[in-house]
Amino acid sequence: MADPNKGINSLELNEGHSEWYVVTEAECINSLDTMEELFEESTDGSIVSNLIDDSEELEEGNSLALYNEQLTEDCNRAILALKRKLTKTPLKSQDRTVADLSPRLEAVTISPQRQSKRRLFEDSGLGEDEATNSIEKKVVSNSLESNESGTLVVETDSIFRSTNRKATLLAKFKEYFGVAYGDLTRPFKSDRSCCENWVISVCAAAEEVIEASKTVMQQHCDFLQVISYGFYALYLVKFKTAKSRDTIMKLFSLTLNVQEQQLMCDPPKSRSTPTALYFYRRSFGNASFIYGPFPDWLAKLTMLDHESAASSEQFELAQMIQFAYDNNLTTESEIAYKYALLADSDANAAAFLKSNQQVKYVRDCYAMLRYYKRQEMKDMSISEWIWKCCDDCNQEGNWKLIAQFLRYQEVNFISFLCALKTLFKGIPKRNCLVFWGPPDTGKSYICSSLTRFMQGKVVSFMNRHSQFWLQPLQDCKLGFLDDATFQCWQYMDVNMRNALDGNHISLDLKHKAPLQIKLPPLLITTNVDVENEASLMYLKSRLVFFKFPNKLPLKENDEVLYEITDASWKCFFIKFASHLELTARGDEQHESGRSDRAFRCTAGTNTESI
């Protein structure tokens, strides 16, 4: 085998014995000195201190934030030390109760304890430090304010985050006020319908604002009741003027600093006794505030008197008929409207409004009223009827205006009186007066005034195609046909000869059998000279003619010169009663010829003893 050391002269040199050595291989050095390390190590042996800054460079931070943080920690430690020094423990203060120290600690108990007795007045504070009480009260008030604000935010968020805000408001209303919102109000579909009385519910409003609204709202209303529970309030308001829902929503949203979604507004059930009792009973509680007297609808349902106690809620038609008869109401609309106005003072009228058959009652009342009036008129003679019409007129007039107007139209006044006398007596062939002449001569003027005074009826020939056009003549003492044309005279010549004679005829009535009747005295105006018309010769003997040739005189202001009114005819009949052979007024009878006892269509009632 070959020798590994061949060709190499091996020298064994001992360290220290020779200054030379042969480098056979390179040494492995792990770390080499860099330029920075050389400079850093060069100062290790320096005798000058801090000649070169060897500290590490630090990044510049937020010194102000650090200072505030340190200052806050120092303050908190100082406050904590002060609290520990001044606050007494329950073991050291036996006179103070747990409830006085903290309301929340009262609920945390290990063993059952007896509740402390309520004190009417706070402790005088002798022997205690005033600083302790002030600090405790301030801490408690701040915690309560934070709790209230947090609760208000939660209540508001629960409403606006709800998918059905209406249902949420209704549920909250019933939870706080103990009754459903629909039980107190009647819904208004339109937001522009006006009403004086309103019920307003407010949800999630600040207590301070609700308290301030009790004073602010007084300028807008006559009555105000506020029932408040925390952030919820219920208003019963009677405004000075009727307002709509839109107006009320804007008013309350500005006054209470809430949105319209937090409000509910509807009129109260003004005819519901439970609704009235709810607000009336709540008025005695501490949570209720009242300004002004109760509304009429609430007072009527809650306050009793001797009249309401004795009255019956059942509607009586006879009382309605008596009212219409006493007030001389002659149309259905007039009866319904004026009787409804009595609902505030008359129990029977209130029962009429509550009924679902008002239309039927009005028709029945009108029908019975016509029956009574018709028979009353038939039982009177023409003289009694004229005296009745005179009594109905409360004014005084001058009969000379009638005489002057007839003289102006060249009519003999004595002939006119004789014609009226035979007309009222119903003498055959003297039962119709005809006033004819040129237009605008006052024919219709004098006839209309006499018909109005005697409460007569007017018929028109334009309704001739109906067989019932003469039906109104059955309910009057005097009839009037205005402006009869030539065709009208031809119709009367063919169909009404017996009627003009003053004899009985068969009169067609709607929905009834023909009536045997004698037509009342008639007044007719026309522009046709019937007296000289050859084709109407058979009517001449049945009519009494008065010609008006002159145009009706007027004043400068276009008013009639001879103003003939009901008072003028009243004075005329009183003046010429003997000439017309009217029955004199008896001493034992009423002025109108009737008995002093008034007509009564209601059943008599016994007066209850008190």
UniProtKB/Swiss-Prot annotation:
Subunit (UniProt): Can form hexamers. Interacts with E2 protein; this interaction increases E1 DNA binding specificity. Interacts with host DNA polymerase subunit POLA2. Interacts with host single stranded DNA-binding protein RPA1. Interacts with host TOP1; this interaction stimulates the enzymatic activity of TOP1.
InterPro entries: Helicase_SF3_DNA-vir (IPR014015), P-loop_NTPase (IPR027417), PPV_DNA_helicase_E1_C (IPR001177), PPV_DNA_helicase_E1_N (IPR014000), PPV_E1_DBD (IPR046832), PPV_E1_DBD_sf (IPR046935), Rep_E1_papillomaV (IPR016393), Znf_lg_T-Ag_D1_dom_sf (IPR037102)
Protein's recorded name: Replication protein E1
Annotated region (DNA-binding region), positions in chain: 148-312
GO BP, one annotated term: DNA replication
EC assignment: 5.6.2.4
Chain positions recorded as ATP binding sites: G437, P438, P439, D440, T441, G442, K443, S444
Catalytic activity field: Couples ATP hydrolysis with the unwinding of duplex DNA by translocating in the 3'-5' direction; ATP + H2O = ADP + phosphate + H(+)
A GO term from the CC aspect: host cell nucleus
Keywords: ATP-binding, DNA replication, DNA-binding, Early protein, Helicase, Host nucleus, Hydrolase, Isomerase, Isopeptide bond, Nucleotide-binding, Phosphoprotein, Ubl conjugation
